[in-house]
């Protein structure tokens, strides 16, 4: 049986240790700012593409006018730092679009994200429906400034880096 009684010498030692301590002022510590959510509603007005038109090995590049070529070069080289990513393997088209919409909305304070769509190796005709839909969706999204296939060691043609218009 464990003795739960505290003897006087232990009490005295404890008191002598904490006696000179002052309680923390509740307002003096730094408060963390909660994650700023986008004031813009998630993009929901997109169309679906039900026929694949892009092969799994095709390199993708798309950018809006006015984007600096340096930014696109950095994206193609993977020199954009750590990026949040979403993996769409196993998703149906509708689920994937909704998930990408939510993902972009949640990460609207980031400049870059990564979307892993796969290469469509299990497709009947060698065309990737998921990759085609992701490209179709990103071209419609108003907050997407550019996207391109990732470097080979970061997903290659089975993933894209996306440059977002930040609202922060």
Task: Locate the predicted segments by residue.
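Long, charged, low-complexity intrinsically disordered regions
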Residues: 1-112, 116-168
């Amino acid at each position: 049986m464990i003795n739960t009684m505290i003897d006087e010498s232990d009490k005295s030692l404890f008191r002598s240790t904490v006696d000179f301590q002052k309680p923390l002022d509740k307002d003096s510590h730094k408060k963390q700012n909660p994650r700023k959510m986008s004031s813009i509603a998630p993009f929901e007005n997109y169309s679906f593409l039900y026929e694949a038109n892009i092969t799994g090995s095709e390199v993708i590049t798309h950018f809006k006018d006015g984007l600096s070529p340096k930014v696109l070069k950095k994206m193609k080289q993977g020199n954009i730092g750590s990026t949040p990513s979403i993996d769409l393997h196993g998703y149906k088209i509708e689920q994937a679009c909704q998930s990408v919409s939510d993902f972009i909305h949640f990460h609207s304070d980031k400049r870059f994200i990564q979307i892993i769509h796969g290469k469509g190796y299990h497709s009947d005709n060698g065309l990737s429906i998921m990759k085609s839909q992701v490209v179709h969706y990103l071209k419609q999204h108003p907050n997407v400034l550019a996207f391109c296939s990732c470097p080979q060691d970061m997903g290659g043609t089975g993933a894209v880096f996306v440059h977002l218009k930040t609202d922060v």
